[in-house]
Amino acid sequence: MQKKSTISWSYDAWIVICTLSLLALGLLMVASASMVISDRQFGYPFHYFIRHLIYLSLGLTLAWVASRVPIKVWKTYSGYLFLVGFLLLILVLAPVIGKTVNGSRRWIQLGFISLQVSEVVKFVTILYLASFLQRYQSEVQKELKGFLKPMLLVGILSGLLLLEPDFGAAVVITMTCLALLFLAGVRLWPFCVLLVLVAGSLILLAILSPYRLQRLTSFLNPWAHQFGSGYQLTQSLIAFGRGGLFGVGLGNSVQKLFYLPEAHTDFLFAVLAEELGLIGEILLMGLFVLLIGRIILIGRRAENSNQLYSAYLAYGIALWLGLQVIINIGVTAGVLPTKGLTLPFISYGGSSLLMNCLAIGVILRIAYETEN
């Protein structure tokens, strides 16, 4: 009995250490970046910090619960969960139900929690896609319909996300799906055809709507529109420049003083770069590399143990988190167009934090089942 109890409480140390380190750093940076705007909006400097702390506590509880749920349960209910996510995407578009913030209708109010539907959809899509790839592996590898079926579903999801609009979530879900299909053994030529179609669409966009294309590519020279479409990015770049090697010190950021919009959410990495400098940036990115690398290793072990659903699930979560990290940092550094994506485990955002922690709980369960 004692041996069984010890095993049931064992967790992957690297996943736990990296996740807790990221969450602690995120809590610290949210406190620093949000004090001024919180005081201005609510007359209390710790409003966003307290809310983030509550979400973090809920997230850790959710991760613990998820680590206790057998993977076969996720597999059994993946289709139903995907359907729930799909219905939520439709409901959020209804003016009576969906909550609009900054021109985007992405949230559903559930008591004191504003649920960002796209964050839920990312998770449930990976759950369902992993199940599809495991059940129809032969079809995926040998027949065109094995590629078209999941891409059709993802295309519908992306269309609904673009109606919100939430371009960033659509990009993450689509790229995660494509990468998982590639890992599952889809032949190369469907990807080539898709690439040609995307290139053709961009050319058509440039011809029919040059203004939209200009907005999409304004990140290439934000200084040309520094008081317009490039304002947020130029302020972010100034934060990077001020940070230098060692930063200006925790809490000493100037850009968070109403210069940089969304300083505690989408552009929190810029505040971190300003306050902690290049050293802080490298530390943060190192933690992400360790975490995502460990998740991939766990997926590989599951694949070697012939637990294909667990393997695809782990790969999907690694791709989701990795893509979101790359896009968020790329946006704040000015090498990618603005997408409106949070930095996993770091940025303020309850839905994102809860789903990230839930995903980590699932990974811990996969690691446990693979080892035992």
From Swiss-Prot:
It comes from the Bacteria. One of its GO terms (molecular function) is lipid-linked peptidoglycan transporter activity. It catalyses: [GlcNAc-(1->4)-Mur2Ac(oyl-L-Ala-gamma-D-Glu-L-Lys-D-Ala-D-Ala)](n)-di-trans,octa-cis-undecaprenyl diphosphate + beta-D-GlcNAc-(1->4)-Mur2Ac(oyl-L-Ala-gamma-D-Glu-L-Lys-D-Ala-D-Ala)-di-trans,octa-cis-undecaprenyl diphosphate = [GlcNAc-(1->4)-Mur2Ac(oyl-L-Ala-gamma-D-Glu-L-Lys-D-Ala-D-Ala)](n+1)-di-trans,octa-cis-undecaprenyl diphosphate + di-trans,octa-cis-undecaprenyl diphosphate + H(+). GO terms for cellular component: cell division site; plasma membrane. Its EC number is 2.4.99.28. GO terms for biological process: cell division; cell wall organization; FtsZ-dependent cytokinesis; peptidoglycan biosynthetic process; regulation of cell shape. The chain crosses the membrane at residues 13-33, 46-66, 78-98, 110-130, 143-163, 166-186, 188-208, 278-298, 316-336, 343-363. It is a multi-pass membrane protein. Residues 1-12, 67-77, 131-142, 187, 299-315, 364-372 are cytoplasmic. The keyword Membrane applies. Residues 34-45, 99-109, 164-165, 209-277, 337-342 are periplasmic. It is found in: Cell inner membrane. Its main location: membrane. It is an enzyme of class 2 (transferase). InterPro entries: Cell_cycle_FtsW-rel_CS, FtsW, FtsW/RodA. Keywords: Cell cycle, Cell division, Cell inner membrane, Cell membrane, Cell shape, Cell wall biogenesis/degradation, Glycosyltransferase, Membrane, Peptidoglycan synthesis, Transferase, Transmembrane, Transmembrane helix. Belongs to the SEDS family. FtsW subfamily. This is Probable peptidoglycan glycosyltransferase FtsW. It comes from Coxiella burnetii (strain RSA 493 / Nine Mile phase I). The gene is ftsW.
